[in-house]
UniProtKB/Swiss-Prot annotation:
GO cellular component, one term: cytoplasm
PANTHER family named in the record: EXODEOXYRIBONUCLEASE 7 LARGE SUBUNIT
Primary location group: cytoplasm
Full protein name: Exodeoxyribonuclease 7 large subunit
Organism whose genome encodes this protein: Synechococcus sp. (strain CC9605)
Listed GO MF terms: exodeoxyribonuclease VII activity; nucleic acid binding
GO annotation, biological process: DNA catabolic process
Catalysis: reaction(s): Exonucleolytic cleavage in either 5'- to 3'- or 3'- to 5'-direction to yield nucleoside 5'-phosphates
Cell location: Cytoplasm
Pfam families per record: Exonuc_VII_L, tRNA_anti_2
Family indicated by similarity: Belongs to the XseA family.
Enzyme class label: hydrolase
Length: 387
């Protein structure tokens, strides 16, 4: 190509042309995964280098946007940047203008592990420190974003399960660099737990990415939760999400709704349980009444048997029985049947012939009198013979 056919530019024209190409040929918005290096604040703007280890590019967050960010990166943080390209034609400088910056999952997990290890070594994270939850709390504080679907679900669940419990809803931001705000709110509530009659606190946030839950890994926030004056229940994110706040809480629930379920009894189950306990108590009392009644009856019988009148009646009955026995055994009864009672002159009974001899005087007593007789003859009975 001849020199007269080549496009000719001044430096300014070349840089302007490059800028125009970038504006027309590159996406107006893009996501950039990078690691932050050497962040510096200059005149309210945040300047930094974004690198992936093999390449780097300058980045900037203008002061107006910096104030709106929920997260401000530190040196070495992995981040996801929502950005656009800025090209300064005067010096052919290419910079990523960050519209939003969020920590990458690797950064969030690294911070989680760091705080967890520190608190475990100090004994702040220790199962033995966990406190039991109140069985039927009269009042609990609920800290979450307002309005939110998580709050709506919690309020509905509380009304269905145990409407007697008062829920004091305290709005808080739940994402970004908001740990100081949450800490201030928690400290204010802690000073009024007795005044408000609070028996537990729920810290809740609905679903989102693990990166969105990074605030609940804040070390100062977690130390405050671990030493809170009332039991703390967390319901943060999804079931698979785990934050340091979950580890220091007295109870970790999988979701915000599950946190309410953990704190409040089920009124239908309680009603059934009350009915069963009432039935058991009724059976117990009835059994006791029957036993006491039988015991009183036994004592009444015993006292009746020991009374003088009863003793006299028993003795009288014994005398009647003995009299009847004596009457049945009386000789008079046998004499009336034709038998006689024989005795010698001395009055001794004659049991048999061996007690008399010829000439003895005998007295024969009969039913209607007696007579005297003399023995003239003794005739023994013939002995029994066996064939």
């Amino acid at each position: 190509m001849s020199a007269d056919r080549l496009p000719s530019y001044s430096v300014a024209e070349l840089n302007t042309a490059i800028g125009s190409l970038l504006e027309r040929g590159f996406a107006p918005r893009f996501l950039l995964e990078a690691t932050v290096s050497r962040p510096q604040l200059k005149k309210g703007h945040l300047w930094l280098t974004l690198t992936d280890g093999s390449a780097s590019i300058s980045g900037v967050v203008w002061a107006s946007k910096l104030a709106q960010l929920s997260y401000q990166p530190k040196d070495g943080d992995g981040v996801t940047v929502v950005g656009k390209l800025n090209f300064w034609a005067a010096r052919a400088s290419l910079t990523v203008q960050a519209l939003d910056i969020r920590p990458s999952l690797s950064t969030v997990l690294r911070d989680f592990e760091r705080v967890r290890q520190v608190l475990e070594q100090e004994g702040v994270i220790d199962p033995s420190r966990l406190r039991p939850l109140p069985s039927q709390p009269a009042s609990i504080a609920v800290l979450t974003s307002v309005p939110s679907s998580a709050l709506a679900d919690m309020l509905r669940t509380a009304a269905e399960r145990w409407p007697l419990t008062q829920l004091i809803v305290v709005p808080i931001p739940v994402q970004g660099s908001v740990a100081p705000t949450i800490i201030n709110t928690l400290e204010a509530i802690a000073e009024r737990t007795a005044e408000l009659g609070l028996q537990a606190l729920v810290l809740a946030r609905g679903g989102g990415s693990r990166e969105d839950l990074a605030v609940f890994d804040n070390e100062a926030l977690c130390r405050l939760l671990a030493n809170y004056p009332i039991p703390v229940v967390t319901g943060l994110g999804h079931e698979d999400d785990l934050t340091v706040a979950d580890l220091v809480a007295d109870h970790r629930a999988a979701t915000p709704t599950a946190a309410i379920v953990a704190l409040l009894p089920d009124r239908e189950a309680e009603r059934q349980g009350l009915t069963q306990r009432q039935s058991r108590l009724k059976d117990t009392l009835l059994g006791r009444i029957l036993r006491e009644r039988q015991r009183l009856q036994d004592r009444a019988v015993a006292l009746q048997q020991q009374s003088p009148r009863e003793k006299i009646m028993r003795k009288r009955q014994e005398l009647i029985q003995k009299h009847q026995l004596l009457k049945a055994l009386s000789p008079e009864r046998w004499l009336k049947r034709g038998l006689a009672l024989i005795s010698n002159k001395a009055g001794d009974p004659i049991p048999g012939l061996e007690s008399v001899k010829i000439g003895d005087q005998l007295n024969i007593r009969m039913s209607d009198g007696s007579l005297e007789a003399r023995v003239d003859q003794i005739q023994p009975s013939a002995p029994n013979t066996t064939s």
